Amino acid sequence: MLPDALPRQLERAPQQVPFLPKEQPEFRLRGGWKGTAELLRADFEEKIQVVHKKDLKNRADYARITTLYTGLVLRARQPGDRFRPAGRGLSKPLRKWMNEAGVPNELRDTLPLLASGSEILWVCGEGFADGLAPDTESRWILHLDAEIETQEEKTNEYAR
Protein backbone atom coordinates (compact mmCIF):
# COMPACT_ATOMS: atom_id res chain seq x y z
CA MET A 1 0.00 0.00 0.00
CA LEU A 2 2.86 2.43 0.68
CA PRO A 3 4.15 2.65 -2.92
CA ASP A 4 0.65 3.38 -4.28
CA ALA A 5 -0.18 6.01 -1.68
CA LEU A 6 3.09 7.89 -2.01
CA PRO A 7 2.72 9.16 -5.60
CA ARG A 8 -0.83 10.38 -4.91
CA GLN A 9 0.43 12.26 -1.86
CA LEU A 10 3.20 13.93 -3.86
CA GLU A 11 0.83 14.90 -6.67
CA ARG A 12 -1.16 16.83 -4.08
CA ALA A 13 1.84 19.09 -3.50
CA PRO A 14 0.83 22.67 -4.29
CA GLN A 15 1.46 24.25 -7.68
CA GLN A 16 2.58 27.40 -5.90
CA VAL A 17 3.27 28.46 -2.33
CA PRO A 18 3.54 31.94 -0.80
CA PHE A 19 7.15 32.96 -0.31
CA LEU A 20 7.63 33.36 3.47
CA PRO A 21 11.27 32.50 4.27
CA LYS A 22 11.05 33.59 7.92
CA GLU A 23 7.89 31.61 8.72
CA GLN A 24 8.28 28.70 6.31
CA PRO A 25 11.94 28.07 5.36
CA GLU A 26 11.22 24.72 3.66
CA PHE A 27 8.92 24.25 0.70
CA ARG A 28 7.64 21.47 -1.55
CA LEU A 29 6.32 21.80 -5.08
CA ARG A 30 4.89 19.41 -7.65
CA GLY A 31 7.30 17.18 -9.46
CA GLY A 32 8.93 16.01 -6.22
CA TRP A 33 10.83 19.27 -5.61
CA LYS A 34 11.92 20.06 -2.06
CA GLY A 35 13.67 23.32 -1.24
CA THR A 36 14.88 25.69 1.42
CA ALA A 37 14.89 29.46 1.80
CA GLU A 38 17.44 30.72 4.28
CA LEU A 39 18.07 34.27 5.49
CA LEU A 40 21.72 34.93 6.29
CA ARG A 41 23.13 37.96 8.06
CA ALA A 42 25.52 39.72 5.71
CA ASP A 43 28.94 40.01 7.31
CA PHE A 44 31.16 41.45 4.62
CA GLU A 45 34.79 41.76 5.59
CA GLU A 46 37.25 44.34 4.34
CA LYS A 47 39.72 41.74 3.16
CA ILE A 48 39.66 40.51 -0.42
CA GLN A 49 38.39 37.00 -1.00
CA VAL A 50 38.18 34.90 -4.12
CA VAL A 51 34.56 33.91 -4.51
CA HIS A 52 33.31 31.60 -7.21
CA LYS A 53 30.30 32.79 -9.20
CA LYS A 54 28.53 29.46 -8.60
CA ASP A 55 28.67 30.11 -4.83
CA LEU A 56 26.75 33.38 -5.26
CA LYS A 57 24.15 32.45 -7.86
CA ASN A 58 21.58 31.27 -5.30
CA ARG A 59 22.05 34.33 -3.08
CA ALA A 60 20.38 37.72 -3.35
CA ASP A 61 19.84 40.93 -1.39
CA TYR A 62 16.68 40.17 0.59
CA ALA A 63 15.77 43.82 1.23
CA ARG A 64 16.06 44.65 -2.48
CA ILE A 65 13.71 41.80 -3.37
CA THR A 66 11.08 42.61 -0.74
CA THR A 67 11.25 46.37 -1.48
CA LEU A 68 10.96 46.11 -5.26
CA TYR A 69 8.57 43.17 -5.57
CA THR A 70 5.25 42.17 -4.00
CA GLY A 71 3.17 39.01 -4.04
CA LEU A 72 6.17 36.68 -4.07
CA VAL A 73 5.40 33.01 -4.72
CA LEU A 74 7.35 29.86 -5.37
CA ARG A 75 5.88 28.06 -8.38
CA ALA A 76 6.50 26.46 -11.76
CA ARG A 77 6.41 28.38 -15.06
CA GLN A 78 3.28 29.96 -16.49
CA PRO A 79 2.52 31.49 -19.89
CA GLY A 80 3.89 35.03 -20.17
CA ASP A 81 6.71 34.61 -17.63
CA ARG A 82 9.86 36.69 -18.24
CA PHE A 83 13.38 36.33 -16.82
CA ARG A 84 16.40 38.68 -16.74
CA PRO A 85 19.45 36.40 -16.54
CA ALA A 86 22.19 37.85 -14.32
CA GLY A 87 24.87 39.72 -16.24
CA ARG A 88 22.91 40.02 -19.49
CA GLY A 89 20.97 43.23 -18.85
CA LEU A 90 17.92 42.14 -20.84
CA SER A 91 14.62 40.47 -20.17
CA LYS A 92 13.38 37.58 -22.27
CA PRO A 93 10.48 35.15 -22.24
CA LEU A 94 11.19 32.33 -19.80
CA ARG A 95 10.22 29.80 -22.46
CA LYS A 96 12.89 31.18 -24.83
CA TRP A 97 15.48 31.35 -22.06
CA MET A 98 14.81 27.69 -21.11
CA ASN A 99 15.37 26.66 -24.74
CA GLU A 100 18.62 28.62 -24.98
CA ALA A 101 19.87 27.37 -21.60
CA GLY A 102 19.17 23.75 -22.54
CA VAL A 103 16.79 23.04 -19.66
CA PRO A 104 15.54 19.46 -20.21
CA ASN A 105 11.94 19.30 -21.48
CA GLU A 106 10.88 17.01 -18.63
CA LEU A 107 11.89 19.63 -16.02
CA ARG A 108 10.46 22.76 -17.64
CA ASP A 109 6.92 22.46 -16.24
CA THR A 110 8.01 21.66 -12.67
CA LEU A 111 11.27 23.61 -12.23
CA PRO A 112 10.92 25.81 -9.09
CA LEU A 113 10.82 29.57 -9.66
CA LEU A 114 10.47 32.60 -7.38
CA ALA A 115 8.05 34.97 -9.06
CA SER A 116 6.31 38.28 -8.64
CA GLY A 117 3.47 38.17 -11.13
CA SER A 118 5.01 37.21 -14.46
CA GLU A 119 8.50 38.44 -13.51
CA ILE A 120 10.81 35.58 -12.54
CA LEU A 121 13.34 36.49 -9.84
CA TRP A 122 14.98 33.09 -9.31
CA VAL A 123 15.26 29.93 -11.40
CA CYS A 124 16.40 26.73 -9.71
CA GLY A 125 19.78 25.79 -11.16
CA GLU A 126 20.37 29.22 -12.74
CA GLY A 127 20.11 31.60 -9.81
CA PHE A 128 18.69 35.06 -9.29
CA ALA A 129 17.77 37.62 -11.90
CA ASP A 130 20.00 40.52 -12.88
CA GLY A 131 20.37 43.27 -10.28
CA LEU A 132 19.57 41.19 -7.20
CA ALA A 133 23.07 40.10 -6.16
CA PRO A 134 24.16 41.05 -2.64
CA ASP A 135 26.69 43.85 -2.21
CA THR A 136 28.44 45.65 0.65
CA GLU A 137 25.19 47.51 1.49
CA SER A 138 23.23 44.26 1.95
CA ARG A 139 22.25 43.44 5.53
CA TRP A 140 20.33 40.22 4.87
CA ILE A 141 21.06 37.71 2.17
CA LEU A 142 18.48 35.29 0.86
CA HIS A 143 19.80 31.84 -0.06
CA LEU A 144 17.44 29.66 -2.10
CA ASP A 145 18.03 26.07 -3.11
CA ALA A 146 15.89 23.17 -4.34
CA GLU A 147 16.33 19.63 -5.56
CA ILE A 148 14.22 16.67 -6.57
CA GLU A 149 13.75 14.27 -3.68
CA THR A 150 15.12 10.79 -4.08
CA GLN A 151 12.76 7.85 -3.62
CA GLU A 152 14.50 7.06 -0.30
CA GLU A 153 13.88 10.59 1.01
CA LYS A 154 10.24 10.40 -0.07
CA THR A 155 9.77 7.08 1.72
CA ASN A 156 11.48 8.33 4.89
CA GLU A 157 9.35 11.49 4.91
CA TYR A 158 6.17 9.46 4.44
CA ALA A 159 7.11 7.10 7.29
CA ARG A 160 7.53 9.93 9.84
Task: Go through each PLM region and give its residues.
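AMP-forming adenylation/ATP pyrophosphatase catalytic core
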Residues: 1-160
